Amino acid sequence: MRHVRTGLPAHDIDSGVNRMSVHPGEFSEVTHTIPQDWASLAHCLARRGILLGPAPPRQFAGGYGNLNYLIEIDGERAVLRRPPGGPLPYGANDMAREYRILSSLWREYPLAPRAMFFCDEASVLGTPFQIIEYRPGVVIRDTLPPDLAGRPEVGTLLSRQLVESLAALHAVDPAQVGLATLGRPEGFLARTVDGWAGRSAAVADLINSRALSEVVDWLRRRVPADAPPSLIHSDFKLDNMILAPDTRRSR
């Protein structure tokens, strides 16, 4: 059984990468919300001197790889993250791993929200979960906010921010944020190609298997040599980036 709590910086960070924001359409309808045992969570937090606020938690729309809820603890907004219910693929939705990364990454990469609390006691919510820093802003999915709609340069603006944010993540030295032992960087690209090959073989009867085989062979012949490791984001896309409400810069 493990519970970990970290504090939040006193200053406001102007940028961050996270799924959470508050504006119309960002929350699931009440009828679609997946309920949690909030009384159990409140008891768990209270035992550690943390107060779960009286405001009803609200589930964020989208992001069903994990379930995300806006909550209030000690008078501040925060986000509870937990895996979805049911069986999970091996290694997926690892809250402990994510907590470890977020607890350190924000020091060198301010686009990352800071982790605040982690619990792996299944009796609380039925699964490990964490609470992370809340970042207000706008998430773009299928509709542009009015101030960006109709601007011909909006595609360039958003694409550049997306690429620059990802490049900044790659530039972080894992050792500088205490993540030197994270993962297995040696042979990562070769293992990735092998994984793609296995998934393509699983659907070979449904698609052009010859073309897939040629692509896999091409990739295997061109796997780059190992280089110093970098951090990567396995699901980096536009709706995983928050835009600040005032500047429309990534935060």
Regions found by a protein language model. Name each.
Residues 231-233, 238:
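Catalytic-loop of the protein kinase fold
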